[in-house]
Regions:
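Hydrophobic beta-strand-centered segment that forms part of the acyl-chain substrate-binding groove
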Residues: 51-60, 65-104
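HotDog/MaoC-like acyl-thioester-processing domains
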Residues: 1-15, 95-147
Length: 147
């Protein structure tokens, strides 16, 4: 899925507004993340090692899931100009190589000064919740200086 970044005025958001994003977590994504961050933990990149663990196979980095939340917040909802204030992330289950995850974001509160609380829930194809949490963001529209 390609996300097209757009700026949305802060007053155009409503509580209950949702956005859904799907992503295949494949070997290329995991190895790219390992190279980018330097996190080459064997549980992520070594099939032989991972088979000997309780997981029985390689698992994706938790940071990949966090990054997907950031990608959707900044690119789709709320969109271009969104600024993170905080993010609570809970990891509930592993994401394995070639799992497809679905992220659903829901605006749960609109606060003063263009701040929003956004519930984040990520599931894999089985329906199992793998990540959840709450993002607090500054909504788009306030970022640019007035002309």
């Amino acid at each position: 899925m390609v996300i097209t970044a757009r700026a949305v005025p802060p007053n155009d958001f409503v509580v209950g507004q949702k956005c859904t994003y799907h992503q295949l977590v494949d070997d290329k994504l995991v190895r790219g993340y390992a190279d980018l961050t330097g996190d080459h933990n064997k549980i992520h990149v070594d099939d032989v090692f991972a088979k000997k663990t309780k997981f029985g196979q390689r698992i994706a980095h938790g940071g990949i899931m966090f990054g997907m939340i950031s990608k959707v917040l900044g690119g789709e909802m709320p969109g271009l100009g969104t600024i993170y204030l905080s993010q609570l992330v809970n990891f509930h289950a592993p994401v394995f190589i070639n799992d497809t995850v679905t992220l659903e974001l829901t605006i749960t509160a609109l606060l003063p000064k263009h701040v929003a609380k956004i519930n984040c829930v990520m599931t894999k194809q089985s329906g199992e919740v793998v990540v959840d949490g709450v993002a607090t963001v500054k909504l788009p529209g306030w970022l640019m200086k007035k002309a």
